[in-house]
Each structure stands twice: as structure tokens, then as C-alpha cells.
A protein has these predicted regions:
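Conserved AMP-binding/adenylate-forming core of the ANL superfamily
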Residues: 20-21, 30, 38-83, 87-91, ...
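Structural core segment of the AMP-binding/adenylate-forming
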Residues: 67-68, 95-176
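Residues that form generic nucleotide/phosphate-binding pockets
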Residues: 28-35, 164
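Short, contiguous strand/loop micro-motifs
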Residues: 15-17, 48-49, 76-77, 99, ...
């Protein structure tokens, strides 16, 4: 199979990673934070975060999760699309010693309830766009901690606009009488 994505890799980024080099994903992350501190780690909506920023934000979020009394190995659900918050949350959960439970943000309440019960998730990090689904099933799950973020939280000034648009879009509905 041709690996066409390789032509988009920046100079110096290896095409392959020796998976035996690291004992865990956390070890890989920690090395990357040091080695590539000033390089872009992720880009979303033209906003980039560096490995240093990813290190700082995930460390802070991981410490917050630990402060909630979750035990090592606890399951933390992540209910968000591909936005900058996702890699931050993933790194935070792993660095804090917890397990990531990926949750489709488009799940129905029934599907979400099943996933949360089946996984035994004790916490969930969710974007506000999907928080109403979480709210509907929360009493029927083991989830004790809910962390809610907004779509534009990591986008700077653009994020303020994105959050306003997302919130306005949620509050307005198409009026069929105008047809």
C-alpha cells in the first residue's frame, strides 16, 4: 500500500516509529514533549498548539483529574470530535495514570449509556455541544465527574467567535412557516 500521507510530513519527521523503543504511550509523549517542544503538535481550524503547550495543558488537566480522587487505572471517557481539546485530554488522561474511553460524540442517549456502563467510566470530558446527551444518562452510570469544554476554548480570539456561533446555532431553529 502506498503511504501517500508521508509526502505531507515536515522535514525530519520519520516515516516509521520503532514501537519497541517505548514501554508506553506516556513514555513516547514525554520524550516528544522534550524533543519537539517548539514544534507544532496539532493544528485545528488554522490554530496550532506546540508540544510544549500540549505538555503544559495536559499536565494541568491530568493533575486536575488526579485531584478528583480517581484511582490509578480509572476510566475517563472522552466525548468530542477531532478538535485540539482531544489530544490534550488524551495525553492528560494517560499521563495521570488513567485509561481513555473514546465515546462517539454523535451517540444517542441509549448508546452513550451503554458505553459508559460497559466501560465503567468514572469521569467524562465532553464538549458542551454534546453535554445534554451526557446529562440525560448520567444518573444511570458510574460517572462521578463531568468536565465540559467549548469548541473554541483553544482557538484564541477565533474561539470566542466559534463559541458564539455554536451557541447561537443551538438556540435557533428553522421556522417552517416561512416556506
Amino acid at each position: 500500500m502506498e503511504r501517500i500521507w508521508l509526502k505531507h510530513y515536515p522535514a525530519g519527521v520519520p516515516a516509521d516509529i520503532d514501537v519497541t523503543q517505548y514501554s508506553s504511550l506516556v513514555e513516547l509523549l514525554e520524550e516528544s514533549f522534550k524533543k519537539f517542544a517548539d514544534r507544532k503538535a496539532f493544528i485545528c481550524m488554522d490554530k496550532a498548539i506546540t508540544y510544549r503547550e500540549l505538555d503544559e495543558m495536559s499536565s494541568a488537566l491530568g493533575a486536575y483529574l488526579q485531584s478528583k480522587g480517581l484511582q490509578k487505572g480509572a476510566r475517563v471517557a472522552l466525548m468530542m470530535p477531532n478538535v485540539l481539546q482531544y489530544p490534550v485530554a488524551t495525553a492528560a488522561v494517560l499521563r495521570a495514570g488513567f485509561a481513555v474511553v473514546n465515546v462517539n460524540p454523535l451517540y444517542t442517549p441509549r448508546e452513550l449509556e451503554h458505553q459508559l456502563k460497559d466501560s465503567g467510566a468514572e469521569a467524562i470530558i465532553v464538549l458542551e455541544n454534546f453535554a445534554t446527551t451526557v446529562q440525560k444518562v448520567l444518573p444511570n452510570t458510574a460517572v462521578k465527574h463531568v468536565i465540559v469544554g467549548s469548541m473554541g476554548d483553544l482557538l484564541g480570539l477565533k474561539g470566542v467567535i466559534v463559541n458564539l456561533v455554536v451557541r447561537d446555532r443551538k438556540s435557533t431553529r428553522l421556522n417552517s412557516s416561512h416556506r
